[in-house]
Curated annotation (Swiss-Prot):
Gene3D superfamilies: Aldolase class I (3.20.20.70). It catalyses: 3-amino-2-oxopropyl phosphate + 1-deoxy-D-xylulose 5-phosphate = pyridoxine 5'-phosphate + phosphate + 2 H2O + H(+). This is Pyridoxine 5'-phosphate synthase. Pathway: Cofactor biosynthesis; pyridoxine 5'-phosphate biosynthesis; pyridoxine 5'-phosphate from D-erythrose 4-phosphate: step 5/5. It holds the Pfam family PdxJ. Its EC number is 2.6.99.2. The record marks E156 as: Transition state stabilizer.
């Protein structure tokens, strides 16, 4: 199967806000980072408004909605408060993620299969408001099928475990995880879902994931913000964009 089209890059700017909040200052500004990302080739900006506001804050979402030219993808937990915020702002996309206060980052996918009734009701008003709803899930068949059942338009496959295995040099396990992700992407596409992928992606892991023909968007943040310390945000994003495009071209 040939790639379905140009692979989009969503840049997550959460950790610009992490640096800002570490000192309680007004800088660095997440919106400024978003605008730099736009100029460097990002197709969209992702921001996770966590319940504890540990990085992105409510006022950041307002500023991003007003200042960005590319679409905003709002990551959030499935709580009434977050639903109300999304319905007020009506971002282009809403990605629903699991959330625990004690975690350092999103550790796994959302359990759609175990909460179909509630999530179907949660998703419906977001869809009615014009938001493209995405479920951040693992490659488990049940979760993919349940995401289609509740009316999500998109699934974002959690690539964190694969990226960790690559970083740890566990080659055989990484190959098995990559194949499971590939099969998950194919299943999701066959069910009419648009397929995205994200979490933990770096220069070392992007090519294999970008080569999945069904994947239409990668969301990448922490690595790019870290790389920006050494080479600048624009250069870091351009480097990722080049690797994505090369992998896509090779898969065509």
């Amino acid at each position: 199967m040939k790639p379905l089209g140009r692979l989009r890059l969503g840049v997550n700017i959460d950790h610009v806000a992490t640096v800002r909040n570490a000192r309680g200052t007004s800088y660095p500004d997440p919106l400024r980072a978003g605008l730099l990302a736009e100029a460097a080739g990002a197709d969209g900006i992702t921001a996770h408004l966590r319940e504890d506001r540990r990085h992105i804050r409510d006022e950041d979402i307002t500023a991003l909605m007003q200042g960005l030219r590319v679409p905003l993808n709002l990551e959030m937990a499935t709580t009434p408060e977050m639903q109300a915020i999304a319905l007020r702002h009506k971002p282009h996309a809403v990605c629903l993620v699991p959330e625990r206060r004690e975690e350092r980052t999103t550790e796994g996918g959302i359990d759609v299969a175990g909460d179909i009734g509630r999530l179907k009701d949660f998703v419906a008003p977001l869809r009615a408001a014009g938001c493209r709803v995405s479920m951040f899930i693992g490659h488990d068949v049940r979760q993919i099928e349940a995401s289609a059942e509740i009316g999500a338009a998109v699934v974002e496959l959690h690539t964190g475990h694969y990226c960790d295995l690559v970083a740890e040099g566990r080659t055989a396990e990484a190959a098995r995880e990559l194949e499971a992700l590939r099969e998950g992407a194919a299943l999701a596409h066959s069910l009419g879902l648009e397929v995205h992928a994200g979490h933990g992606i770096s220069y070392d892991t992007v090519a294999e994931i970008a080569a999945f023909p069904q994947v239409m968007e990668l969301n990448i943040g922490h690595f790019l913000i870290g790389e920006a310390i050494f080479r600048g945000l624009g250069s870091a994003i351009e480097g990722m964009r080049r690797r994505m495009d090369a992998a896509r071209e090779a898969a065509a």
